[in-house]
Amino acid sequence: MFLAGPETERLTHRAKTEADAAAFYALNSNSDVMKFTGDVGFESEEQAAQAIRDNPDFERYGFGRWGCYLKATGQLIGFSGLKYLPELDEVDLGYRFFPEFWGQGIATESALACVEFAFRSLELTSVIGLVLPENVASIRVLEKSGFQADGEIEPDGMRVLRFRVTAEV
């Protein structure tokens, strides 16, 4: 089980704990952050804490979406990581950061580290990224991280673009 994820020059990745609930709530109730996710934000800090407690991905699959922390301060600035999507039988890269960290290359730095982790540590052969067509910034992060367009799908009735990166053999 990989509770600790990759490290980069500026970032560490690890499983979120209940101590992160306030920041996790703030992230997932921010309308700018949630605009392109297709998710419903948290209504309370307790709901965020419950989501942290109830996350079975690390136990079930050995990996998940890690909290993403600045190395310099230890501050939770978002999350990034891998999630197995059983309905697609694919592993998806997802990330979400506070707006004050947008435009600094952090999402790309984190995405590249997570993809490398997927291929080296988990020995996956491909990873997908699902993104709403209007989320141009996220599409750019995926492209900078080596992903290529791989069609459109409609999980849960919502049209999304699928991007894919494959391991170099």
Residue ranges of model-derived segments:
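Conserved GNAT-fold acetyl-CoA-binding loop/helix
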Residues: D32-D54
